[in-house]
Amino acid sequence: MRILYLDPFSGISGDMFLGLLVDLGVDPEKIKSRLEKLNVEFEFVVKKENKKGVTATKVDVVFPGKEHHEDHIVSDHDHHHHHGRHLSEIVEVLSRLEDPLKEKAIRMFETLAEAESKIHGLSKEKVHFHEVGAMDAVIEIAGAVAGLELLGVEKVFCGTVNTGSGFVMTEHGRYPVPAPATAELLKGIPIYVDQKVRTELVTPTGAVILKSLVDEFRTPILRVEKVGYGAGTMDLEIPNVLRGYLGYIEPSERTGDVLIETNVDDMSPQLFGHLMERLFEAGAKDVFFTPIYMKKNRPAVKVSVLCHESKKDEILKLLFKESTSIGARVFYPEKVEATRTVKTVKTEYGEIPVKIASFDSEIVNISPEYEACKKIAQEKGIPLKEVYRAVCKSVSEVRDDV
């Protein structure tokens, strides 16, 4: 499994995260291409900067004739003369993108608005974003999602986050670090307050990236492929960079997952579909039903739920509420999995991504990405199996490159 491990020893911001992705090999023009449907005129200005002896990639989002503004993207709600945007306007802009990029970016901006609304005592719709700051965040948030996809990352891990300390000036006044909305976004995320760094190290955009895109806040056992650095804007006593490790989880790495099972023999079949939906909504990684026969030859269904250990109690509570079960078994399985990478192959129908599974340094399986093949089949009006056939013809070149 290809993963990205973030080491935010000097905090995180939207531009630092973009800089890290580019430093790890993502082409900024490809990110920009993914965002073309926004119909927003902007440029990525990419340069190398030296931060206390560490060479890092700096990425700025530049709008023609407008000043960069990312640190605080919410306007003073008591001064309506500000030019700005509300959440509905931001969602309208993001809705021009294609799924899943659109869905993830909108969800992230809604998370940002929810934090601001809670702090300022407003509804989400009344949160007022700076005109330029909001568009900065739109590009950085959508670019973060697109960049991870281009990098082929399947899971994001993160270490403890340095927030900095002291106070910061905003349009609302002098706020402690982290600022209230940022602190709200950081709930549930491991942080530490570095009293030696008297400035704000985590911006709201950086916090929402952590909140929305990080799968687990822990240090995994991984084989490192690349190390990258995204540059921040400040010159501090420590390098103002976001460090990231791109690599693979070792097959022996424990997943931290639990398997919950229960046998149900007295529930209406109509309720099982609803149960599955609710379990996925609650954070289950997988849910499956197995027909079984219990004592007295009574037909029943074994409900199996795979989830992260942190979700165990929530899943159990939901299982008891939404089913007739009054007991469940909890297992801690050790998962062994092949290393997975994503490559692109050229076919007569265009470029198509394929998943490559390797175990013990040997390729054991190559499979086309279903959604990409389905989209091409629909666009060209051809059978899906014809697209699969074209991919299989081109698979030999992938084997040679791995």
From Swiss-Prot:
Keyword Calcium included in the entry's annotation: no
Domain of life: Bacteria
One GO process term, biological-process aspect: protein maturation
Reaction equations catalysed: Ni(II)-pyridinium-3,5-bisthiocarboxylate mononucleotide = pyridinium-3,5-bisthiocarboxylate mononucleotide + Ni(2+)
Listed Pfam families: Ni_insertion
Keywords, sorted A to Z: Lyase, Nickel
InterPro entries: Ni_insertion (IPR002822)
Role description: Involved in the biosynthesis of a nickel-pincer cofactor ((SCS)Ni(II) pincer complex). Binds Ni(2+), and functions in nickel delivery to pyridinium-3,5-bisthiocarboxylic acid mononucleotide (P2TMN), to form the mature cofactor. Is thus probably required for the activation of nickel-pincer cofactor-dependent enzymes.
PANTHER family: NICKEL INSERTION PROTEIN-RELATED, PYRIDINIUM-3,5-BISTHIOCARBOXYLIC ACID MONONUCLEOTIDE NICKEL INSERTION PROTEIN
NCBIfam families linked to this entry: nickel pincer cofactor biosynthesis protein LarC (TIGR00299)
Name recorded for this polypeptide: Pyridinium-3,5-bisthiocarboxylic acid mononucleotide nickel insertion protein
Source species of the chain: Thermotoga sp. (strain RQ2)
